Design a protein with these regions (language model features):
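Short coil/turn linking the two alpha-helices of tandem helical-hairpin repeats
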Residues: 149-151, 156, 206-212, 377-380
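An aromatic- and glycine-enriched ligand-binding surface/loop that stacks and positions planar moieties
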Residues: 20-82, 190-328, 443-446
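Conserved, well-structured interaction surfaces
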Residues: 38, 42-54, 80-152, 168, ...
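Long, intrinsically disordered, low-complexity segments
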Residues: 19-21, 71-79, 94, 107-110, ...
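Flexible, polar/acidic helix-loop-strand segments at domain edges
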Residues: 84-95, 301-364
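Bacterial Sec-dependent N-terminal signal peptides
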Residues: 1-27
Length: 490
């Protein structure tokens, strides 16, 4: 996708700051009288990108925190916010959970803004530019629907402005209605962007199985992305951007990044909050200035997975996770207590919640590993899919594989799944992968029963059941339309 014009984005922050969008799941947006030409439509498009900030603020809690990668920093907090997060961490979510509701609203707010843009596209007289805008916002809408479907199952299709009285009578659509129709090649491919191809590949890989034509289509889409010049057509690990440089704030939007949610520090209102959200509590400004929440703390489980894979050599561990920090007052390293944190999004700030780090949504290694996975499921290990698996391993500094090491489909599957976990940690991919592989319940229960933290709680942390892999429809939505079917178990 195009790089966001930050000045234009700041304008959109101000323009939309007073809008009261109602996402239950209405898509009414107040009439924009100033929308008269391509420039004003471009501002609306930038507003769609900006709305992703509200989505991402909570998405890690709906995904990474519910997996075996992230957890609460400690047991026993009594704050209301911590209890909401604790529900997501332990699978005890209730329909009244405010974070679940706010994430739902944020997704539908983005969809509403996209629909608003589409309603004004006719004022753009340049066909190429009009198609570009349409392709961009359709991508964003498809991304939000994809996440909604994976987290809730059937949800509401809103593709145009819907009067509130109509929305109150809407029913949830089936997954079949949402995915294949709303994310078809023709829909996403209009902008001819790698981000669209990559997203469609992920949709097909999630919704179909080996043996389906669209599953094979997913593999072909991955290969098209990997062979494109815009990502450098990588053939080995040395062709990829160094792992630590992928997330470097001085190297943003490098060739590894296919699509990212962008942030800008400097008190512009579009800075990243995640440094403060993820830094350890009570760190005395030794990790980051301002309040720190200690959310999304890396688990013992994932640290063990890194150490087992790399035996101290895996470069990704130190990029993604810090296990200590330096106390400048005592001039000592803090290695006990709440010292562990997700390091990937922590960078120096002058104002709290105002970081620079972008959040990668789709990147080259994701698609390389997905291609390796899909082609293995279709026809087993080969020199071709092994190349893309080893490309990622080589860059990480861990041992590569041979076909002798991975002689069977099962052996290759196990290796590529593990590599996806270590490579994409804390990018909100792990939970979706576990769902796609059908092992979310088993994996999370194994983790809950082995993580040391959970033995410190005053109550038993119970296993989750299959129905708990879906989130509950927010109670506020049910209150508006009591005829809406709630997800099983809630």
């Amino acid at each position: 996708m195009k790089k966001i014009n930050y000045i234009g984005l700041l304008l959109i922050v101000m323009v939309f700051s007073a809008c009261d969008l109602d996402q239950y799941p209405y898509s009414e947006v107040a009439a924009d009288k100033y929308v008269k030409d391509a420039s004003s439509v471009n501002n609306l498009v930038l507003g769609c990108y900006n709305s992703l900030h509200d989505v991402m603020y909570y998405e890690w809690a709906m995904t990474e925190l519910r997996s075996d990668n992230g957890r609460m920093y400690a047991a026993g907090s009594s704050s209301n916010t911590t209890r909401l997060v604790e529900q997501l961490d332990q699978g005890t979510i209730v329909p009244e959970n405010e974070w679940v509701k706010t994430y739902w609203n944020a997704c539908y707010a983005t969809i509403a803004r996209v629909n608003n843009v589409i309603s004004y596209l006719d004022v753009v007289t340049d066909e190429t530019l009009r198609n570009q805008y349409e392709g961009e916002v359709l991508f964003l809408r498809s991304l939000e629907y994809f996440n909604l479907v994976r987290l809730w199952g059937p949800v509401f299709i809103v593709t145009s402005k819907v009067p509130s009285e109509v929305a109150r009578d809407m029913q949830r659509s089936t997954v079949d209605e949402l995915l294949p129709g709303k994310m078809a090649d023709g829909d996403l491919g209009r902008a001819d962007l790698n981000s669209a191809k990559a997203l469609l590949a992920k949709v097909y890989a999630t919704h179909y199985q080996a043996g389906d034509e669209k599953y094979a289509r997913a593999a072909r889409l991955c290969k098209e992305v990997l062979e494109s010049e815009s990502v450098g057509n990588p053939q080995s690990g040395s062709d990829l951007v160094a792992y630590d440089k992928v997330f470097d704030i001085g190297n943003e939007m490098n060739k590894e990044i296919i699509f990212a949610v962008r942030y800008l520090s400097g008190n512009a209102g579009i800075g990243s909050p995640f440094g403060n959200m993820f830094a350890p509590v009570n760190n005395g400004a030794n990790v980051i200035i301002g309040t720190s929440s200690g959310y999304n703390t890396p688990t013992d489980n994932i640290i063990a997975a890194y150490e087992q894979r790399g035996a101290g050599a895996d470069k990704r561990l130190d990029v993604n996770i810090a296990q200590k920090y330096f106390n400048t007052t005592t001039q000592t390293w803090v290695t006990e207590g709440n010292c562990r944190y997700c390091k990937k999004y922590v960078n120096p700030v002058t104002t709290q919640y105002d970081g620079e780090s972008d959040w990668p949504v789709i990147r080259v290694a994701d698609i390389a590993l997905l291609y390796a996975e899909l082609t293995n499921e279709i026809s087993g290990p080969s020199a071709d899919n092994l190349k893309y698996l080893n490309m990622v391993c080589e860059r990480a500094g861990v041992s590569t594989y041979t076909l002798t090491d991975l002689p069977s489909l099962y052996d290759f599957r196990k290796a590529v799944r593990n590599e996806r976990r270590l490579e994409l940690a804390f990018e909100n991919q792990r939970w979706f992968d576990l769902l796609r592989w059908g092992i979310a319940t088993q994996t999370v229960n194994n983790y809950l029963n082995s993580e040391l933290l959970y033995t410190e709680y005053s109550y038993t942390v119970n296993d989750i059941e299959d129905w708990q892999t879906f989130l509950p429809i927010p109670v506020s939505v049910i209150d508006i339309n009591p005829e809406i079917a709630q997800n099983t178990g809630y």
